[in-house]
Amino acid sequence: MIFYLEENRIFVLETENTHYVFGIDSAGYNRHLHWGAKCDPADYAFTEIGDENSNHSMLDEYRQELTPFGSTVYRTCDLKAQFADGCREVALCYTGYRLKDDTLRVAFADAYYPLQVRLGYR
């Protein structure tokens, strides 16, 4: 079963014994929140990281569901692209979701280039 907590923009994938939880934070980043024993959905919240500096990137601390290459991400990325003008930075923005027949599709688009990404869950 999959359900969406609209007020917090959080998705919960539920099995008999577990929850897999991720969501879209206030800045539009996709963030992994929990995988494990079922919890009360009220317990799922985004942790804000505010002490960013040149040696410590908040994007490196965020456990993103999908980590695109670019910005201040210094760890291994899940998505890399090179656009026609040579740019290799991907700036994904959340554009919406579709939940139908217990299949979830979460959509993102690049802020500057014609790239669309959809994550699928069943």
Residues covered by each model-derived region:
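N-terminal accessory beta-strand-rich subdomains and adjacent acidic, glycine-rich linkers
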Residues: M1-R122
